Amino acid sequence: MKQETKCLHSGYVPKNGEPRQMPIYQSTTFKYDSSDAMGRLFDLEDSGYFYTRLQNPSNDMTAAKIADLEGGVAAMLTSSGQAANFFALFNICETGSHIVASSAIYGGTYNLLGVTMKKMGIDVTFVDQNLPEEELAKVFRPNTRAMFGETITNPTVSVLDIEKFARLAHSHGVPLIVDNTFATPVNCQPIKWGADIVTHSTTKYMDGHGVSVGGAIVD
């Protein structure tokens, strides 16, 4: 399917007798016939919807649409773009880890990496993304766990050489995480160029109307 078709139809395939358009499930909880059934869900022994903070059909369908647009396997929605970046990085890093990141990134993300994660014992080296590969390779350490950049930087609108960053990251055995907020998957799919994980602030162009705050992680 073309991207335009995916925007309209991906993520939701109605079965016989189901709504033609993707419904919005406005419920915090879901009903089951017994407390035993609920207990198995809360213990994560069975799969199913029981509490919207953990899972919701509307969220899952939207995440599936974003994953399809990005060419990923799956996606997860978050409360904001910064939450998406935090979860993507913190799932990989721990105290004592090191991150290599482009210095030409959104101010909130720069603060997340340079201040918030530093308080957690995670170090970051910010680099000029336009330096040649041999210069960038010098900043990697044995404890480097991830490389980070933005497809189109906010607000300087510099374009990241994703293939170059991917080569560097993979040659050092770490994943490349790319924030694709400004480009959106309509204009660029970083996974095609070597990125391993893609993040979004859906608040920006993906929302398109300035009425909601959200984020997404695509693997």
Predicted feature residues:
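Conserved PLP-enzyme active-site core in the AAT-like
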Residues: C7-V13, A75-D219
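Generic structural signal for well-ordered, non-membrane alpha-helical segments
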Residues: M1, P19, Q55-N59, Y106, ...
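Conserved N-terminal alpha-helix of the aminotransferase class I/II PLP-enzyme fold
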Residues: S34-F86, G108-T116
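Acidic-residue sensor for enzyme active/binding pockets
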Residues: E4, E70, E150
